[in-house]
Amino acid sequence: NFENPNFKLVSINVSRFDANKHMAESVVGDAKVSLLDISNALGNWKAPDDWYKKSREALNSWNNYLDKESGPTNQKLPSYAHVAGAIYRKSDPSDIAVTAAGGLVGEVLQVWRPRELNTHETEWGFSCMSYEISGALGIKMANPKKEVIAFVGDGSYLLYNSDIYSSVITNHKLIIVVCDNGGHAVINRLQLYKGGKEFNCLFESSKVDNLKNIDFAKHAESLGATGENVSSVSDLEAAFVRAKKSKSTYVISIK
């Protein structure tokens, strides 16, 4: 599209500063109101019929790609996409996915294709580490009859996890999936990709003398939740089914 000389991009944002994008016509305002105004301004104009057909074909191709990349796998260490895919396949349309920060955000955002409104919450603007569990608790309080699933890396989990206890004692059940990759892996990757050296992001390469492995399932149990460690995508799917049946907060950890 950017190669098309007639291509026009419209950028809508409530902030005048953020509405300014390269090669875009800036519109400052609420997205819903602005779209209605733009639609009214267009009158009877509509995109060619083959444009809709093209968009559906592209969407189907994208969904097929996602299903393939996030599908069942026997590889020793599953990817974030595999983890998100396993939970998505076993979830119900009303289940709400919550994530923030790290590599999980990008993968969950792509794999979790909402089947109902308001079933995907991502804190991405500030990559707010540890929003996952506390945010999930707030969402559960607002949606007590729905399953709320928090996807969280071990780094964010270690920074803030006490709302597991809060969820238990207030009877606001959460399902928490902990992806244990041994530290702040995305920041470590950024350091390396920018030409730097590892610096205290992955635990095993940090300057420590007494490194200990953490049993996140046992830690969750100490806060009153049910905890379970799994080692494969198929085990994760089975654990998630058990978590769905549980009456209280359930934490599943996978490396």
Q: In which residue ranges do the predicted regions lie?
A:
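Short coil/turn segments at secondary-structure boundaries
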Residues: 50-54, 100-101, 253-254
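Non-catalytic alpha-helical coupling and interface elements of nucleotide-dependent molecular machines
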Residues: 40-44, 92, 248
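Active-site diphosphate/adenylate-binding microenvironment
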Residues: 59-134, 139-140, 145
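Glycine-rich, acidic loop regions that bind phosphate or pyrophosphate groups
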Residues: 1-54
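Thiamine diphosphate
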Residues: 3, 19-20, 26-28, 32-38, ...
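A diffuse structural propensity rather than consistent per-protein peaks
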Residues: 46-48, 79, 215, 232
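Domain-wide signal for the mature, well-folded portions of proteins, strongly enriched
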Residues: 48-54, 88, 112, 210
